[in-house]
Amino acid sequence: MAFTRQALAVYEKADKNWKENMATKGAYVVQDAANPDITILASGSEVNMALKAASLANGKSIRVVSVPDLAKFASLCPCEQEKIIGNPKRVVCTEAGISTEWLQFAKKEDCFCIDRFGTSGPANKVAEYLGFTAEKLAEILNK
């Protein structure tokens, strides 16, 4: 396994208690929407992609949630999860990994994940090769 640091943009968090919520709930709201049409659950660098995809979605009200600890978030009672997810019409999940664990929150067609072995190379080139881009995620959001 090879690890590398990515040059990721730092984003403003809508949740002012994000550090506490990340530690105690495993997730926090990055971009809020009062009555979201869609909530995107994302982890790691996919949060940046989710924010870009949300900006490309046509007329949709979108909440973006960072889920750095999926196991902790999944262990919360449904009422606590709903406080973070909101009450959207759809939940879309994205991760540069398999979708299995995300299926408890979204339908298979709403999991924008990589359910196959990848390839090696610069992160942006590999993502483009695999079709794992903000533009492709925006297509799912616009369905």
Where are the language model's segments positioned?
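Thiamine diphosphate
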Residues: 2-143
